[in-house]
């Protein structure tokens, strides 16, 4: 009983103490904070644009919180969306050391997608409210059209870009390789591009010229002599020859191709069979037995099915010395994939693969599920067109066009074949023509209006090259349609500097045999090749 009295006494003392201490606490209500006016995604050009955020912060007790309110502190941080560290082993970077409400800071980050974090702290209660948003940082070389040019009379190799920063923002950038270690080379020939989902090599980008071919870092475009294709992809570097044409053979594998193939300016062909451990280019394959010396020269073209996902396992070359088509095919025996073989004629076929003519041009398309077009010329200067279907086992003679009603076709050296319609485009001087192969009718493309001092330097359709087009980061109908637009590269020979090049994009009307200009960019050198740098 005595213990109960003691407990009751202590409880009373404590209760009195609480009443006495009543004025020592702040019973202010907690404020609810809402954050508005922050976009879901901010897209910027790295080391050029600023990351700008102007949020609206509202307190349920104080109303809208303004810049300089001493009761609140603001924090902005950034981290990689894919994870990993930013700098000095830290996961986050503080974008706003001054703790101000509004953010305006240079986007000094590598091209990638990041998560931005904005936090509001009520310093009176210590309660913090936050929200996140994406920050997509692009570089001039991150995504867009790689425009390979020859600059000036010396034809210095120069890479320009049409950078796709966003759907609404497309910006030309010029001579992007000059500060990135690219050597001084002359006579550009083309761009080799092999996107794939393998960790090694990942996306492959080659700039090809008559003085050397160099691989570019897939993110930064940096390069040096160690990235010379002879040092990267060849077991034994070839002698005095340079890779000038590069292509891949794709089947239905969504991760990688079956093989990479190339041709040098010496007329030698090489095969890199990707299923082989330590795959690399070996000895020339334009020979009768693996490892032996070449016995003929091949033209600088490689015909494959461009269907995606891939549907073939073969490629077609052209033997310039013996005027015949030669075949490469994926197989189960390594040595058979290191030799080209004559393509056998089938009884009753539309044409023979031993043509007795010179090859003028060859192009790979998606038309008819993988048709390769070849323009051939006989000794009398007359031209015809063969269509070889390369789907499946390939080498199917599918079409042949003779006696073309095509003005100046015999003078043309620049061509492009459409992948949706039976159309051939060709250029002579500053004129572009559309030839309908189905009706043997030619239409001058008057909507492609070039001046008297302008000449066409390139015609092309940029077919996307991902192993699976479903991997592309942009699945919009508009973006997919871009690959069927005619690209027209032209040059003004009267330009006061070396920047007289233009690149126009023309959607093709398959009903009215016509084209219309969608966009045009200028300031380039003499355009040789254009390839879209795709992203997954």
Spans of model-derived segments:
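Sec-dependent signal peptide recognition
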Residues: 2-9
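Short glycine/acidic-enriched loop and turn motifs that connect beta-strands
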Residues: 151-155, 212-214, 267-268, 322-323, ...
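Repeat-based blade/solenoid architectures
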Residues: 183-188, 345-358, 405-412, 450-471, ...
């Amino acid at each position: 009983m005595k213990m109960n009295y003691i407990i009751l006494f202590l409880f009373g003392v404590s209760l009195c103490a609480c009443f006495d201490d009543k004025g020592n606490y702040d019973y202010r209500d907690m404020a609810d904070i809402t954050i508005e006016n922050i976009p879901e995604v901010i897209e910027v050009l790295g080391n050029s644009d600023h990351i700008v955020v102007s949020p609206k912060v509202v307190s349920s007790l104080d109303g809208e919180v303004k810049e300089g309110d001493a009761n609140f502190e603001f924090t902005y941080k950034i981290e990689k969306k894919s994870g990993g560290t930013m700098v000095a082993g830290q996961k986050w970077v503080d974008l706003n050391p001054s703790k101000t409400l509004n953010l305006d800071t240079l986007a000094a980050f590598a091209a990638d997608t990041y998560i931005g974090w904005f936090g509001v702290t009520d310093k009176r209660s210590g309660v913090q409210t936050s929200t996140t948003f994406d920050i997509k940082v692009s570089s001039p070389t991150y995504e867009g059209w790689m425009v390979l040019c020859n600059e000036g009379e010396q034809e210095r190799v120069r890479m320009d870009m049409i950078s796709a920063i966003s759907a609404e923002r497309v910006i030309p950038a010029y001579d992007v390789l000059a500060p990135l270690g690219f050597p001084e080379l002359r006579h550009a020939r083309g761009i080799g591009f092999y996107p794939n989902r393998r960790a090694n090599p990942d996306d492959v980008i080659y700039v090809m010229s008559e003085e050397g071919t160099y691989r570019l870092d897939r993110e930064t475009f940096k390069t040096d002599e160690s990235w010379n294709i002879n040092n990267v992809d060849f077991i034994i570097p070839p002698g005095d020859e340079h890779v000038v044409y590069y292509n891949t053979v794709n089947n239905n594998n969504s991760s990688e191709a079956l093989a990479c193939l190339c041709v040098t300016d010496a007329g030698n062909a090489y095969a890199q069979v990707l299923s082989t451990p330590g795959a690399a280019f070996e000895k020339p394959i334009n020979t009768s037995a693996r490892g032996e010396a070449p016995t003929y020269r091949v033209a600088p073209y490689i015909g494959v099915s461009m269907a995606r996902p891939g549907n073939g396992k073969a490629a077609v070359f052209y033997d310039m010395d013996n005027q015949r088509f030669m075949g490469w095919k994926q197989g189960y025996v390594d040595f058979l994939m290191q030799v080209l073989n004559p393509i056998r004629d089938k009884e009753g076929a539309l044409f023979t693969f031993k043509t007795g003519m010179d090859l003028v041009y060859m192009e790979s398309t998606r038309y008819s599920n993988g048709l390769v077009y070849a323009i051939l010329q006989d000794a009398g200067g007359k031209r015809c067109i063969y269509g070889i279907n390369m789907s499946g086992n390939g080498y199917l003679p599918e079409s042949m066009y003779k006696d073309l009603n095509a003005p100046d076709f015999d003078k043309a050296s620049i061509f492009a074949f459409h992948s949706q319609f039976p159309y051939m485009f060709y250029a002579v001087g500053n004129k572009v023509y559309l030839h309908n192969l189905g009706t043997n009718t030619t239409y001058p493309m008057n909507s492609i209006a070039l001046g008297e001092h302008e000449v066409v330097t390139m015609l092309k359709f940029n077919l996307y090259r991902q192993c699976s087009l479903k991997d592309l980061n942009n699945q919009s109908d508009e973006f997919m349609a871009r690959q069927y637009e005619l690209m027209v590269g032209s040059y003004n020979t009267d330009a006061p500097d070396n920047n007289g090049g233009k690149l126009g994009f023309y959607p093709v009307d398959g009903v009215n045999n016509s084209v219309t200009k969608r966009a045009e960019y200028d300031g380039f050198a003499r355009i040789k090749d254009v390839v879209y740098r795709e992203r997954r």
